[in-house]
Amino acid sequence: MHVEKLFRMKELRDLTIQVCEVARQAGSYIRSERSRFSVDKVERKHAHDYVSYVDKGSEQMIVGKLRELLPEAGFITEEGLATHSDEQMLWVVDPLDGTTNFIHGFAPYAVSIALIRGKKILIGVVYEICAQECFYAWQGGGAFVEVGEKCEPLHVGKSEIGDALLCLQLPYNSDAYKPVIKKLIERFYGNVGSIRMIGSAAMALCYVAAGRLDAYAERYIGQWDYMAGALIVMEAGGRVTDYGGSDDFTEGDSVVATNGKVHDTLLEAVRNA
């Protein structure tokens, strides 16, 4: 498949469907390993940040299959098993987003795959392993969720801030973010519908796209955490920026994603936190 063809809508759609199958296969591997998983096989990358052989096995599988689909693309991956140099397009892969959830048998956790060219996100696929939901989008094509034979378009919710369900995640860099999360909870607790923390950036974004959450904010995260989900939110009618309010968020470490209606309120809060 030639690079220039990727900008044709049908080519993007067809490639997205193929990436969904890759994500499902990786998800099936993760699901099967969970039944015999032992915490003794967990490694600590940093404080409160873990990796298992399952993360690495999933990444190896995904990288191999994506190379077959698009040999000319490079990779940005969480576990660093594949790299990039001067390729025009890059796969951005989180082989298991929500590793801590996985270790504890606590849903959700997911496979996240995006394709980018420069600062443009062309494809986003997130497969939630427990519920077997595949969320996906391609640039200009809308966003969808598929479970079994059932496929539905995604649309963000319509709640205003007083009724909104917010997701305020806790990143691994807890010392740096502790004063921020305290201020955010103080600002919103009792002033919104409710607040959740779900342990997966990719799934928080997909839940915003599906209208299950109205907003999500997190800092000190990697591109692999948010890239696929960000496109899904935008294609579902939502808004995504960094903590500074810039729409150019793809090289940063912060994300604010909302239904649009509550964006300015949440953005003001994170700026002042």
Regions found by a protein language model. Give the residues of each.
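N-terminal subdomain of lithium-sensitive/metallo-dependent phosphomonoesterases centered on the IMPase/IPPase/PAP
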Residues: 2-96, 247, 261, 268-271
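Short amphipathic alpha-helical face segments that pack within enzyme cores
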Residues: 61, 110, 228-231
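Short coil/turn connectors at secondary-structure junctions
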Residues: 71, 87-88, 119-122, 162-163, ...
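Hydrophobic/proline-rich hinge and linker segments of small-molecule sensing/allosteric domains
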Residues: 143-146, 166
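An extended, acidic
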Residues: 154-273
